[in-house]
Structures are given as C-alpha cells and as structure tokens.
Amino acid sequence: MRVMIVEDQTMIRSLLESYFRAEDGYRIVASIPGAKQAVEVCRASSVDLILMDVQTENRENGLTAVHRIKAIRPKTKIIVVTSLIDCAVLEEAKKAGADSLWYKDSAEKRLMDVVRQTMDGEHIFPDAPPTVEIGMAKSTEFTRTELKVLRHLLRGLSYTRIAAEMGCE
C-alpha cells in the first residue's frame, strides 16, 4: 500500500513514518510538510492512503487539500490527523471528503486500527475531541468562542487581528 504523510512537524512526521515501517504491506512514497505539495504529488501519481495534518507548513490548510485531492483521486483514502480540540474540525473534515480522523493524542495502535478500518471502507470519526489540559483548565471547559480565540492565538494573530476576524470592534 502506497502511503503519503503530510505533517509539518518533523518529529511527528518521523514518528508516523516509523509506525508504517514497523508493519508489513506499507510503502511510504512521500513524507512532506505541506498540503499544497500533497496535491501536486497526487496530480503526478496515485497514492492509496494519505495521513493529512489539518494545519501544515506555511499555514496551508490540510482540509482544503483533502477536498482538492478527492476531486483528483476520489479513491484515495485520506485520514485527517490533528491535535486541534475543536468539534468544528470533525465536521470540516467530513465536509472536505476525509475518510476518517485520528487525534494525535491517541495511541499508535489506535492509529493503525484506524488505517486498517479506513482501508476496509469504514469511516472513523470520533464522537467528540479528546479532553486536553490547557494550563489549569480542561478543553471541555472552554466555550466555542474561547476555543476560536485560542486557535487564532496559536496561529500567531495579534489581538487586533483576532478582534477583526471575530467581528468585534
């Protein structure tokens, strides 16, 4: 099975590669940091499975790439991989055409189970994101708006830009 890994963090990308190398039947044909690159790889050749991070190199949107890849290669299975703890990501991944979603906080064994199930035609989407500790609070204690502000902060936006993005004065 031909596998492409799209992950901007080198250490995470290497870890994901090691999971596939430890199992028979998988061949990593591309391991790249950017979503735009993934679309180009799919234009040039077929891939059986893609692990696609939501936010990749240069803030490229992995979900946009999922949509574009599915238009080019509808039979390619795509598992969205994320550490974002927002229910909106689940819905956006489904709308983009992802076949499954896996949270980075989950175990290696769980990823390989999701891979096998996805390749067998199942769609694996958790009911809700995992609960994560953010400082002294749990992710489940934040409102959608608070999570949206946190996401903007993680993207490096200024307070002024966040206010503008959220329609505040």
Model-derived regions: residue spans:
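Short, flexible helix-to-coil linker/hinge segments that flank and couple to helix-turn-helix
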Residues: V89-K94, D99-R144, K148
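Active-site residues of response regulator receiver
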Residues: D53-Q55, T82
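Conserved acidic carboxylate
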Residues: E7
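Helix-turn-helix DNA-binding segment
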Residues: G135-E169
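Short amphipathic alpha-helix used as the core "switch/output" element in two-component signaling
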Residues: L63-K75
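Acidic, metal-coordinating helix/loop segments flanking the phosphotransfer/catalytic sites
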Residues: S31-L49
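Two-component/phosphorelay signaling modules centered on CheY-like receiver
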Residues: T10-A30
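A short, hydrophobic beta-strand element within the central beta-sheet of small alpha/beta folds
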Residues: K75-I85, A98
